A protein has these predicted regions:
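Membrane-water interface at the C-terminal end of transmembrane alpha helices
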Residues: 111-129
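Membrane-helix boundary connector in multi-pass membrane proteins
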Residues: 68, 87-106
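Core segments of alpha-helical transmembrane spans in multipass integral membrane proteins
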Residues: 17, 21, 42-64, 77-87
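Non-cytosolic membrane-interface motifs at loop->transmembrane helix junctions
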Residues: 35-44, 72-74, 98-109
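Cytosolic juxtamembrane helix and N-cap/initiation of the first transmembrane helix
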Residues: 1-18, 125
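Membrane-interface helix-boundary motifs at transmembrane edges
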Residues: 1-7, 64-72, 97-100, 128-129
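Juxtamembrane "helix-exit" motif on the non-cytosolic side of transmembrane helices
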Residues: 27-35, 64, 90-98
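Alpha-helical transmembrane segments of multi-pass membrane proteins
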Residues: 19-29
């Protein structure tokens, strides 16, 4: 069994905090989000908030594990979620005409997701070595 490295633990904790924080924004401040979004569909915001909440809580569970093998699948799912979200953000910006405030938010999301993916991949490959 391989012990989880300190940086990986920090990244898992970061994923948890970020997941719960963004889940709170999407679940609680849905009306604020919808006020500038081009489509009136709260369900998509709730679905995103729910998935972020689940991933955030799973991060906290993973943080308290001590063996890499116990959290490897979770970590791979997080990396796939980041990658899929990056592709989705690109598609949204290309396909939908967004107000300027949302273009800025999508760019910010893109930067955060790239950061998440890069640091996650770094930890993943360091953990395997």
């Amino acid at each position: 069994m391989t012990e989880i490295k300190k940086l990986t633990k920090i990244v898992i904790l970061y994923y948890g905090i970020a997941g719960v924080l963004f889940a709170f924004i999407y679940l609680v401040f849905t009306n604020f989000q919808l006020s500038t979004w081009p489509y009136d569909d709260p369900v998509s915001f709730w679905s995103l908030g729910n998935s972020l909440l689940v991933l955030g809580i799973a991060s906290f569970f993973a943080y308290f594990k001590s063996e890499w093998e116990h959290i490897k699948l979770y970590f791979e799912i997080m990396l796939m979620w980041d990658f899929g979200s990056i592709l989705m953000d690109i598609a949204i910006v290309v396909v939908i005409t967004l107000p300027e405030v949302w273009v800025f938010q999508m760019i910010l999301n893109f930067v955060l997701l790239i950061f998440n993916l890069v640091i996650g991949l770094y930890c993943y490959f360091k953990q395997r070595s």
